[in-house]
């Protein structure tokens, strides 16, 4: 007799019609909170409404309901993303010079916006080449479209309409999965199933379908474009997909179909799945055949990864078991209990995801210029600078967000009674040692990194160049970085025998790729100047980490306020009668961390902008002589603070300051306006609440005199609200100022 284990019952994972659909809620602002729903007595009401509208934790303590709201909101977010994408593609279809750019990407600039003449704004429509007048864009969309095989504005139209359909679909899904079929909590907590689906589905099949698109559509179309064939003559994407003979003309192995795959004769496919390294000399981008190969390989990895976790079949990893077993000799209980944390606290989960995604975004920023993935991206200096800056800012914000949600987790979701001697508990128990050591590191880095600059400024002022730290006097070469560069340069034929060139031209070697007389990429030399500024990077990053980590580790308690957890994530002070306890909440640490994040990223993007203009970007003559935009002045000028002020900020601001009366004048106005927004922030940051309350009361008195006083009492912003408004305008003003400064400069000279 065979004894079988009983078949697992099929679990019903959704509730039907849990929340009725009604528009009545929309007419009641603050319906999620009893106090706010009563309506405004004072102007504080509108601030509380904004602060709490998306704080689902404060609406209910039911984890299932919170999870459903987050899940539904994600579909809304996706809908907005599709809507935005549709707008980008529609602009490409309706207002752009894409087809002209496609025919001559080296002499024609990308533009997808033509300004209407109302009171003279048409001055902004600059001549981007090919007889087209419009605003030069630096988003990189044209390069992506070419890489994906889009050859006409009609195709952009169709894609834009497709994205709108998807936006509507996402909007519907958000409604459906909250009001009609809402998942149960168990579904949100089914980690193994989620991993399998996300790894195999999103990343595995996603990469596989992109690889398929690249092989069947992008590669043949780009091969024709590179050979100078008129885009109108090139067969349409569906013709390549449906007609194998067309592909076989370009890649003969296509005639054999899938036979080489099943007979393990994979080298047959080396025509379109390559491992070359380096850049395509025609377009200055990575070889598209390398990119297709990469996506195929990634797809295989993720498809395997998506079959590793135990679900309905009793085979595979259990995440809980992995975490429970994760104990080292010095880590006590290790990761015991982490599984419960990550399945019951979405803040903890989000914190990890933000930290990893933020780091990844910064990695993307560094790869976009060193391994430019799209055709003609590397020679479009404005786009290169924009993409680097954009990804650095986004990465910085995501990492601060990681600290914010880690602190919210500590305050709202951490239960000290059930956590003993696991890794988190052990970190919390020696937090004083961590923070004081980190503080020492920050002081060391700060004094030494700035000390090197100040030494140079002093020696320069005294006329003693021989006593400066520079490549021509006292050298401080970044020997470790140079060793890494050299190792990568020598890799082809040695540690990477299959590759014909190293992963990036920036590592070294004699290669230079120029397209249409412009430098795409060349080896980037590192010297004393880079050594100095890298230590400023180390300093600013460590200070950011110090502030954020202190906020997380002291979110629940500190010697100053032992019961901090009871006060919540954000509070102004520990009540009246306890002086010196203001601005210690976890929220305030995020607030301060944002300023240092801004410092960190600013130094990075300034370094990048100047270094590339000095040592990489420029033109190449017929004799092969390279002339860089700023003539290689980085190595000698950036080693003093005065050099940064004079030869970078001041010298390169001339384009934005003198932009009036030209097509770049919008950047001049933005530069001015964003400085104003930034200065406006200081009013909120340097002034106390009482000052404004007194002022408001005089103004209210005047209104009462004239019998025009409003029913809703005006109130000064609370301390936290004032700081929030301040930091928002500080960052917005600073980022927009930098944006105007960079773009006016690089569009004028690049």
Curated annotation (Swiss-Prot):
Places the protein is found: Plastid, Chloroplast thylakoid membrane
Binding site for chlorophyll a: 683, 691
A GO CC annotation given for this chain: chloroplast thylakoid membrane
Any Gene Ontology biological process: photosynthesis
SUPFAM superfamilies (UniProt xref): Photosystem I subunits PsaA/PsaB
Protein name per the record: Photosystem I P700 chlorophyll a apoprotein A1
Taxonomy, superkingdom: Eukaryota
InterPro entries per the UniProt record, alphabetical: PSI_PsaA, PSI_PsaA/B, PSI_PsaA/B_CS, PSI_PsaA/B_sf
Catalytic activity: reduced [plastocyanin] + hnu + oxidized [2Fe-2S]-[ferredoxin] = oxidized [plastocyanin] + reduced [2Fe-2S]-[ferredoxin]
Co-factor binding comment: P700 is a chlorophyll a/chlorophyll a' dimer, A0 is one or more chlorophyll a, A1 is one or both phylloquinones and FX is a shared 4Fe-4S iron-sulfur center.
Binding positions ([4Fe-4S] cluster): 573, 582
Membrane topology: Multi-pass membrane protein
Subunit structure and binding partners: The PsaA/B heterodimer binds the P700 chlorophyll special pair and subsequent electron acceptors. PSI consists of a core antenna complex that captures photons, and an electron transfer chain that converts photonic excitation into a charge separation. The eukaryotic PSI reaction center is composed of at least 11 subunits.
Membrane-spanning parts: 70-93, 156-179, 195-219, 291-309, 346-369, 385-411, 433-455, 531-549, 589-610, 664-686, 724-744
GO molecular function (one): 4 iron, 4 sulfur cluster binding
Family designation: Belongs to the PsaA/PsaB family.
Binding site for chlorophyll a': 675
Class of this enzyme: oxidoreductase
